[in-house]
Amino acid sequence: MQDQRELGGAAGQGLPLCAFLSDLPEQGGGVSLRQVSKDSGAPGRQSGDAVEWARLRCALPPPDGEARTSGGSCEGLSTSTARGPDPGEHSGAWGEFEVFQESSASSEQFCQSFELQERPAASQPWRTASAQKQHGSSQPHQGGVTGTGAIAASELVVSCEDVFRSAFQEVPVPQATEGISTLDHFLEARNEESSGLESAQKLCSESRKLWRALHNTGTMTISRCTWSESRSRENFLPVLGVDAAQKSLSGSPGRTLGEPGLHEPEELGFHLQRCRALIQTKLSGTPTGGQGSLITYSLFLKTPIHGNGQYITTPRKKKTFGPRNLKLTLFNSDIY
């Protein structure tokens, strides 16, 4: 009772509470807040003294038996004082702080949920990789995005292959190796009856004869009969660039080569009397088919001189080609 009186008198007189705390080393933890509030006489200072005394009481080291009780009471008191402030003080400060704490926590939860929704693909591969490591290789694509992406990629590749196969279908082409003859077979065949292609032989018989005659340039095998037979001459001269239907100077219609006004060949060429024509005068070379062999032919303009029976020869054109080109020229010009 004496301690309570001294404590009540100290609270009524307004003395600082720190002076009494040093005198109460063991009983400080047992003093209650209710006693201080009863003995305090000033109503304006009642709540402030109670709060400060409660804080100082919590700061004191409690006894061993009352450690849990004093701790629980201090925690309850601090929460009660924090949630229930004095009406005389600014009542909006702690309330705003509590509202700010609640709003910050909710905003953090909202940001976390928004980030999870915004980036699902970035977080799930790591989860799937760890899950695959835990579950092993027996379940490689179970419950993950990487497995689904791999399956979708493989399906995409297969679909592209199907599109290309449907667009570019494979058509089997049989290999036709029978019944194909080369150009040399037509132009250089010795036995016309043994080839087996009678229609082709009939078309290429004259060309074959002319080719053989050109092949043997060492002898005078190009006779007027061979040169004038069928249409070989008429087709072969335009191929070489010879115009065989030139008009005469007098305006009379020109006579083609091989008509009665034609003289005998002179140096493997022809000349006409009383007309002007481009004629072939020389065909040299060894068309044996070997590499490096060339055939050269020269074209001259021969103009007859009136009354003398002589001609003025003017060179016009000279061309050199290989035997292979001559074969193609003869065959493609439909010479028969």
UniProtKB/Swiss-Prot annotation:
Q: What are the recorded GO MF terms, alphabetically?
A: clathrin binding
Q: Where is this region: Disordered?
A: 29-93, 116-147
Q: Which InterPro entries match?
A: Aftin-like, Clathrin-bd
Q: TM segments?
A: none
Q: Where is the composition biased (Polar residues)?
A: 70-82, 125-141
Q: Which GO terms describe its biological process?
A: intracellular transport
The entry's cellular-component GO terms read:
AP-1 adaptor complex; trans-Golgi network membrane
Q: What is this protein called?
A: Uncharacterized protein CLBA1
Organism of origin is: Bos taurus (Bovine)
